[in-house]
UniProtKB/Swiss-Prot annotation:
GO terms for biological process: D-amino acid catabolic process. The keyword Zinc applies. It comes from Synechocystis sp. (strain ATCC 27184 / PCC 6803 / Kazusa). This is D-aminoacyl-tRNA deacylase. GO terms for cellular component: cytosol.
Amino acid sequence: MHLVDTHVHINFDVFAADLDQLQHRWRQAGVVQLVHSCVKPQEFDQIQSLADRFPELFFAVGLHPLDAEDWQDNTAGQILAYAKADDRVVAIGEMGLDFFKADNRDHQIEVFRAQLAIARELNKPVIIHCRDAAQTMRQVLTDFQAESGPVAGVMHCWGGTPEETQWFLDLGFYISFSGTVTFKKAEGIQASAQMVPPDRLLVETDCPFLAPVPQRGKRNEPAFVRHVAEAIAALRHVPLETLAQQTTTNARNLFKLPVPA
């Protein structure tokens, strides 16, 4: 059984002491490929070094909405240059909108649209962070696609209702679920995980955050994506192997990941 963890942050300091053991555990859990997200372009060299160390690691480059104030006149050029510099860059992101306690919504939208344009130019998918912003996100994506054409991508660590989920499915996006789908009170997320079409479903950890049950409260890590897959398989009443195969195929289709030899 093979799994792809489509969203990790193993460059964070919390992993520095045991990266080799981390790899051993994710391989034991069946994880054969990972997509490393990027919070800001300055992380690029560090993430690239991790991909040199771990051949199953692919990565993105972009600016997180919580860091939107760091956007400078040269940031778009940096992202473009980094994305062109390495074939292992499979996406632009993570980008998006985070309106939880935000007082810079208009600026976040500007930065988000700028990164959508980069992805469109490079024909790469986007990794989207959306928190407390689903309606605005829907409008921004709808407007951008009407103006510039379709952009592929994934709504990562998805926490929306089934109605909101359908909005982004209709826009052509994949939906990725994290450890939150295992939480007892996450009925809305669980309902969304049940209704996503099989060919648009992805799994992730978003490690080191949001460890799934039964590891909740611990540092999250890529091996725990198996718990996410098990929970979604149970919700959808399908064998784990079926869900693993489908989500792995989906990840490779979206991110154009090679099939390991």
